């Protein structure tokens, strides 16, 4: 029953969790991006007139230079002989080290804008989403870009003058994972050739193309597409690399012929690599190491090593005699700016890689100094903003010891002395410029985190206040019988009023955003209410733990905290869930269940489920596992139908048989799709259509047919729900997930029966045991986490395999593909929702008791993850901590959603002749 107290409680909880969900992005992940900086030109006498940037999307560094055995021809060869010849004779080469996430948008932003998008960019997509900061394209005279519609628009739309960036893009339908990826790259080279041809008959176009400072950007998506579809060790991936190399060999002389000079600079690199599983996104070296080969005007020729340099990673490259010059990905933007004399992008944090520059030491020094001034300017603008918004400002300690003006004076003094002939001072000036850049970047981070301590303290008090306040409300609504009329004392009002005014003034002076005021409002409200309702808290705890000694209370609390902390660690190491499951295998015995058969089945199921969190979260497609699990799903459906056949009418029996038939048909369709895709024959049209038809029928028509003549038995309803989602789960299975689906459903049914037996024992003893409610809530919350982590983790989603998705959607489209992934993730939650609803029915638990108790305790997880958030390290690690926090803070709210959804799923369901409506009348009010 909903009353005003419950509604107020839910509303406050909803607002609190939504605002505090946002808090991490306002605290930890505020963008260091600043605007209004002066611009610094990299080079007054640029060595190149134009620049070609060629990006092999998804190209690994080792594949570019390794001698590999072709899986089809059996021939051992270098895949890119032309690039190798450049490395050995004409170019400077190295590895470009990317940051995480190793995705297309952040990779291109880093190399073209010189800026690593802050972690708040994880909330952004990449399609049609313009970059909101300066870039090499923005500074260029004109940019001609060719390639993917996922990359080109964000730089064209984000340019200060979109007309200066031209884009030739293929349609999204070209990105078909089952077709030849070479066609994507062929489109780029064809249109580059067409541009040259058109310029021979269009004088205006030719004039524009002949201008100094132009950039030609060739985005080659083929390797990424082939890697996703067939893995980076496939013939398709290797052939795509060979195709790119052959086209580069044709392109370079065409460029020389068209422009009639050798004043073109070429930069070849990649945005990210590719894992052995055909995915990217995380911090694995195969994803973060990309090739960088730069040749042409203004660029050094190769430097030979006096002594060959060998290491395990490059031993098959046969390039030990050539010096390798590694860079950070953002450094490429500074290099490109220097080559054609552009202003450094105003938000760039890249450092000019001097090893690539062919110029005098004085030229290099001046360019590097301007690079340092460009980065320092970002710090100075940010510092000015900070000084104007702080009651007391403390300067960055390193600049307090040695001011930025002192750095500038020293460097300029050294430059003057070098100009007067003291060239031996050049290394010192370069080192000082690099030190200034490093200190300015550290100072920028210091300013970004300046107010952390204050606002984190507020959020911490908010979480602790919510846990205490919500538990008090739970006790009042569900445990205590009598009504309390509590009023806030004048002293309470006065003290909290004064504190509110003082803290809000601090926020106002700091020009804090609106959200900060809300972060402050919640702890002030919670702690005021806690002091007012302290009597309820005291009486409620005494009632809930009636008959339980103080030592036992401490033990129960310690156990609950241990389980929650175990769940926290399980977010990072899934094997913790294995331990918890094996401990849960013993709980029926300790709760007094003497039935050996029940204990044996429960223990066996617990241990079987515990194995899943030991499997690798990143799965490899296995048709054998899909077939075995699919047959078990069909067999389990037939067995369950036999068990309930005496309870159901002929209509229900026919519909269930149809559901089982659809499941068997989906298994056949999945087999055909997987086999065809593995044989590189594409996705058969009939299999694609059949997959969508079966999925639609199982999720829509079958439930409607049941609704015409519904069975109200809870076991039948569970079977119907189980078979409704089984075909969808099966076609989206990569390997072992359908085993999980079967065992998880069985586990939930066993849990219901065990708790029903424990309830019967309590009734026989004529005792009201609130500890059963506490136990159900804790186990239910654990299963809520396991429903997600049983088949994967956050990292496996961030770089999820497309194997299952392109059985239904062979053409790349991230949003529908993401929707299918979310549907697969949600299905175990629907099963859990059903189980909790039946538990409420069988145990006569008042509606929303379980979810309210979880809501009041589960933010122990949220508080943990708030302090476990990372802002440094790999983007995978950072992204995982963000996702963990979001999962934790939303999971308690999700329990309410599950309980609400269970009312819909279990409408009119009966247990032993008693329907929900009748059951509710017997519940305590």
From Swiss-Prot:
Protein topology in the membrane: Multi-pass membrane protein
Protein name, UniProt field: GPI ethanolamine phosphate transferase 1
Gene Ontology BP annotations: ATP transport; cell wall organization; GPI anchor biosynthetic process
Keyword ATP-binding (UniProt): no
Record keywords: Cell wall biogenesis/degradation, Endoplasmic reticulum, Glycoprotein, GPI-anchor biosynthesis, Membrane, Transferase, Transmembrane, Transmembrane helix
Any one GO MF annotation of this record: mannose-ethanolamine phosphotransferase activity
Keyword Cell wall biogenesis/degradation: yes
């Amino acid at each position: 029953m909903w009353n005003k107290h419950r509604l107020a409680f839910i509303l406050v909880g909803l607002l609190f969790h939504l605002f505090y969900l946002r808090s991490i992005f306002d605290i930890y992940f505020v963008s260091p991006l600043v605007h209004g900086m002066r611009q610094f030109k990299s080079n007054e006498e640029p060595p190149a007139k134009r620049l070609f940037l060629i990006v092999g999307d998804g190209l690994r560094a080792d594949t570019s230079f390794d001698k590999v055995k072709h899986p089809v021809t059996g021939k051992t060869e270098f895949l890119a002989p032309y690039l190798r010849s450049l490395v050995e004779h004409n170019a400077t080469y190295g590895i470009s080290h990317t940051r995480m996430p190793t995705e297309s948008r952040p990779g291109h932003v880093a190399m073209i804008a010189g800026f690593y998008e802050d972690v708040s960019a994880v909330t952004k997509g990449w399609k049609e989403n313009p970059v909101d900061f300066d870039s090499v394209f923005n500074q260029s005279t004109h940019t001609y870009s060719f390639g993917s519609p996922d990359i080109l628009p964000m730089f064209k739309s984000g340019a200060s003058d979109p007309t200066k960036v031209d884009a030739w893009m293929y349609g999204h339908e070209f990105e078909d994972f089952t077709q030849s990826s070479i066609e994507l790259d062929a489109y780029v080279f064809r249109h580059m050739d067409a541009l040259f041809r058109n310029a021979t008959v269009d004088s205006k176009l030719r004039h524009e193309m002949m201008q100094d400072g132009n950039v030609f950007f060739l985005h080659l998506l083929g390797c990424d597409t082939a890697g996703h579809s067939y893995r980076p060790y496939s013939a398709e991936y290797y052939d795509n690399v060979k195709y790119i190399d052959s086209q580069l060999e044709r392109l370079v002389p065409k460029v020389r012929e068209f422009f009639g000079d050798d004043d073109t600079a070429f930069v070849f690199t990649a945005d990210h690599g590719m894992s052995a599983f055909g995915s990217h996104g995380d911090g694995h070296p195969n994803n973060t190491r990309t090739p960088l080969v730069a040749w042409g005007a203004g660029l050094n020729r190769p430097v030979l090593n006096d002594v060959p340099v060998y290491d395990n990673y490059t031993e098959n490259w046969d390039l030990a005699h050539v010096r390798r010059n590694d860079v950070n990905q953002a450094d490429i933007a500074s290099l490109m700016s220097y080559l054609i004399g552009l202003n450094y992008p105003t938000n760039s944090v890249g450092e000019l890689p001097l090893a690539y520059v062919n110029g005098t030491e004085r030229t290099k020094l001046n360019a590097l100094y301007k690079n340092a001034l460009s980065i320092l300017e970002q710090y100075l603008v940010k510092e000015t903003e900070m000084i104007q918004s702080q009651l007391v400002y403390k300067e960055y300690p390193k600049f307090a010891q040695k001011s930025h003006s002192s750095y500038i004076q020293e460097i300029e003094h050294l430059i003057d002395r070098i100009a007067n002939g003291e060239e031996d001072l050049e290394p010192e000036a370069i080192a000082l410029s690099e030190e200034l850049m490093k200190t300015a970047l550290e100072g920028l981070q210091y300013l970004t985190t300046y107010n952390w301590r204050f606002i984190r303290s507020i959020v911490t008090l908010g979480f602790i206040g919510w846990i205490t306040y919500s538990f008090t409300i739970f006790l009042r609504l569900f445990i205590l019988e009598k009504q309390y009329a509590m009023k806030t004392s004048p002293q309470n009002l006065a003290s909290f009023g004064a504190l509110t005014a003082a803290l809000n003034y601090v926020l106002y002076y700091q020009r804090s955003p609106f959200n900060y005021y809300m972060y402050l409002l919640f702890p002030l409200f919670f702690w005021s209410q806690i002091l007012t309702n302290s009597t309820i808290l005291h009486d409620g705890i005494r009632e809930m733990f009636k008959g339980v000694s103080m030592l036992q209370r401490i033990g129960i609390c310690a156990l609950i905290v241990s389980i929650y902390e175990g769940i926290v660690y399980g977010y990072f190491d899934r094997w913790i869930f294995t331990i918890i499951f094996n401990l849960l295998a013993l709980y029926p015995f300790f709760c007094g269940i003497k039935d050996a058969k029940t204990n044996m089945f429960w223990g066996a199921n617990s241990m079987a489920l515990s194995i899943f969190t030991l499997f690798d979260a990143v799965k490899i497609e296995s048709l054998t596992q899909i077939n075995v699990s699919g047959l078990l799903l069909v067999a389990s459906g037939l067995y369950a139908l036999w068990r309930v056949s005496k309870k159901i009418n002929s209509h229900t029996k026919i519909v269930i048989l149809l559901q089982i038939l659809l499941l068997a048909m989906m298994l056949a369709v999945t087999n055909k799709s997987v086999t065809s895709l593995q044989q590189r024959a594409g996705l058969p049209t009939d299999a694609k259509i059949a997959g969508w038809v079966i999925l639609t029928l199982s999720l829509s028509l079958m439930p409607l047919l049941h609704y015409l003549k519904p069975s109200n038995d809870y076991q039948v309803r569970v079977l119907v729900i189980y078979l409704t989602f089984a075909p969808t789960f099966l076609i989206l299975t990569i390997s072992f997930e359908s085993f999980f689906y079967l065992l998880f459903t069985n586990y939930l049914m066993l849990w219901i029966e065990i708790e029903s037996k424990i309830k019967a024992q309590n009734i026989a003893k004529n005792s009201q045991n609130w500890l059963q409610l506490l136990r159900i809530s804790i186990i239910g919350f654990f299963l809520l986490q396991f429903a997600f982590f049983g088949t994967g983790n956050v990292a496996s989603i961030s770089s999820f395999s497309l194997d299952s998705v392109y059985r239904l959607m062979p053409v790349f489209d991230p949003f529908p593909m993401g929707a299918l992934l979310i549907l697969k993730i949600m299905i175990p939650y629907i099963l859990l929702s059903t189980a909790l609803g039946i538990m409420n029915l069988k145990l006569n638990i008042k509606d929303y008791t379980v979810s309210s108790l979880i809501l009041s305790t589960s933010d122990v997880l949220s508080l943990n993850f708030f302090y476990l958030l990372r802002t440094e390290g790999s983007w995978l690690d950072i992204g995982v901590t963000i996702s963990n926090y979001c999962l934790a803070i939303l999971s308690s709210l999700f329990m309410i959603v599950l309980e609400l959804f269970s009312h819909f799923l279990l409408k009119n369901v009966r247990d032993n002749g008693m329907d929900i409506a009748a059951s509710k009348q017997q519940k305590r009010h």
